[in-house]
């Protein structure tokens, strides 16, 4: 019944299978890509009617993780998959950026790629399979693509390159997470996060991944040959006939406009030129389609003039040199009540970054198929419409904003201190207040500056730069440093590089041509390093090390360690004790299973008092210790005295004073403040107290114990803490 075609390939020790003809047969292309027990169904459908009223390729890519793939039922009130998670959006963009360069430049048909994770094996990540499956589905769909691609993940473990490293392999620390997509002869996409990898090693990793793809691409070609579907015919767009006329009459004006230094000046002049061009062809510009074709022809001419400037005159838009960085202005500490802030301006691109420090309760809980984790470092990128002088509604984060934010986060992640060193939750918000290209890399720079201004102990600055490419005939090309928005639009590449002074922390490559070779990547790295060093120098001149103190508006935290068996005493029955502490001192208390206690609060004095109260609760009482206590209950045979927070002891009527007492109520009343001494502890740890304290004995005890005095409400207590029960609090020793 099914005419299934199945290809299996041994890919560096892992069996990759590609199957088509069994599932989703109404799609133009459908491939089930599997490795281990991970399977991803990739489908492609395109509209057979070409859109004539647009000048872009309408491609939509959607990656979806179904809970059933991991044997789960979605959590929450509604037990089904909801909106796309950030991870799903990021993988969707990863696929899109890998396959978009493959399409014919004249193809303008609505195209949709859907990748669904059908089965999940924790050892194998489905994102690589989604890229491979999408490439295979496109190859058999009838869509005119240049050539199929493969994709691979590369890691570095024990200084060796690993292809598609197993996710939960604990044989060593992975210094690199690199994804490479490529055809037989060129690279189409790169995405990477690294631990300060030098440029030479990164290039070798890219080459390793690129050269590993041959078996995958061969398998896709074999499936394509087996199906032999007719290829959809694409016709050249009619705007091409306007090009020569525009070039002849307006090239000088266009060149002069492109050389203007500011974005606003250029845009104003180019808009005037556009109107002149439309007026020149007024006899033909009688409908929207004709105007669109004329505008597209003008865009082609701008691209040609831009390329001639770069390749022949060795200059570029804004009259800059090929490797020239736009003027940079850095400023740190703009707002007093914000925990940290910085403004980074590069040319007409500007990012305003702010830092907020929070407690462990502010951590982001992220649930994926394979894990549920808490993230204490958050970075949000917000692209504001006024940054490009436009009006648009403010909505939830777009796919582009999510992608740019995650790229900046990956670039900064390496320098963020561990929770052991800096226990705060860190949230960075980067608001793009001006934009003329490379706003994600401006975010990296502003985030790094704001972290130091906030006093977060990062070890060094991270800077980012966007590199461009202009291809000429033959092997001729030029690499551009710090591209503007117009250069991104007219050029062939947007290669974002983030790095410290020691090495690369993040990469992202997008291209508009069919691919680039390793020589171009090497040249990009070499030129990017020079640019990044320049940017780092400017940043270090503004602020070169973290502030020694946090903002007075930031929450304070103190950490102490208690014995595991004492955790229940701090929590209390039904959480009574910990709730009382939080309410009394207006703090948050976080207790881990290993006995680490963190106390958070906005008022430092309250945090210290809460810590002292916890110390009082967990201390080990010793016979002879003397305390200031409070009568909390009186019965016929004696009284119960609260001698520390959460601790009561019993005073028998015979221990009230040295005389015989007939009526205890005549001597002690509820709420009385009394001095008590421990005279006994039974096998159930019940404490027996006496009011008949010996002053001389008290003096001797003060020589053996350290005093800590704390106030809870109107109760003042002096606590005797034995030296052998030492606890470390914020690098200072107290005694428990």
From Swiss-Prot:
Keyword Transcription: no
EC number assigned by the record: 2.7.7.8
Record-level Gene Ontology MF annotations: 3'-5'-RNA exonuclease activity; magnesium ion binding; polyribonucleotide nucleotidyltransferase activity; RNA binding
One of the GO BP terms on file: mRNA catabolic process
Pfam name, any one: KH_1
Residue stretches making up the KH domain: 555-614
Localization per record: Cytoplasm
Entries under InterPro entries matching the protein: ExoRNase_PH_dom1, ExoRNase_PH_dom2, ExoRNase_PH_dom2_sf, KH_dom, KH_dom_type_1, KH_dom_type_1_sf, NA-bd_OB-fold, PNPase
Its biological purpose: Involved in mRNA degradation. Catalyzes the phosphorolysis of single-stranded polyribonucleotides processively in the 3'- to 5'-direction.
Family: Belongs to the polyribonucleotide nucleotidyltransferase family.
Protein name stated in the entry: Polyribonucleotide nucleotidyltransferase
Organism: Orientia tsutsugamushi (strain Ikeda) (Rickettsia tsutsugamushi)
